[in-house]
Amino acid sequence: MKNKLLFMMLTILGAPGIATATNYDLARSEYNFAVNELSKSSFNQAAIIGQVGTDNSARVRQEGSKLLSVISQEGGNNRAKVDQAGNYNFAYIEQTGNANDASISQSAYGNSAAIIQKGSGNKANITQYGTQKTAVVVQKQSHMAIRVTQR
């Protein structure tokens, strides 16, 4: 487990601007955790991914400065994707349950977005093109879908 975690951390740190975590583990459920902090030329980008369960996947792409992304997944078959560009943007995805799908896309300056999914089969998408926008989506049931676009 320690060698697997070390290899994963070195792989993630070697890819500037991209963090990916998956837990396609055939053994019992474990807690997977990845942190990628990119401080090259004061970019100060950080991606934090925590996973418990099976077949969860998380992907983060950051291009800009002062960017923070946090993804927490518990359950199975959850998918999370964060795409950040610009400056001072914050994205948070929390998934508890199974087969949830969440994505956040941010550009420009000073945006905050959060998706919280507690249930199964939910889909949520937040897209922020403007400056200093805030969006929060909470899905507490199953099979719900929402798309938020802020310009």
Curated annotation (Swiss-Prot):
Name of this protein: Minor curlin subunit
Signal peptide: 1-21
Chain's role: Curlin is the structural subunit of the curli. Curli are coiled surface structures that assemble preferentially at growth temperatures below 37 degrees Celsius. Curli can bind to fibronectin. The minor subunit is the nucleation component of curlin monomers.
Record's GO cellular component terms: pilus
Main location: other
Protein localization: Fimbrium
UniProt source species: Salmonella enteritidis
Induction: Constitutively expressed in agar-grown cells (at protein level), part of the csgBAC (agfBAC) operon.
This protein's UniProt keywords: Fimbrium, Signal
UniProt-listed Pfam families: Curlin_rpt (PF07012)
Keyword Signal listed: yes
One Gene Ontology term from the biological process aspect of the record: cell adhesion
InterPro entries for this protein: Curlin_rpt
Stated family: Belongs to the CsgA/CsgB family.
Lipid biosynthesis among keywords: no
NCBIfam families, alphabetized: PRK10101.1
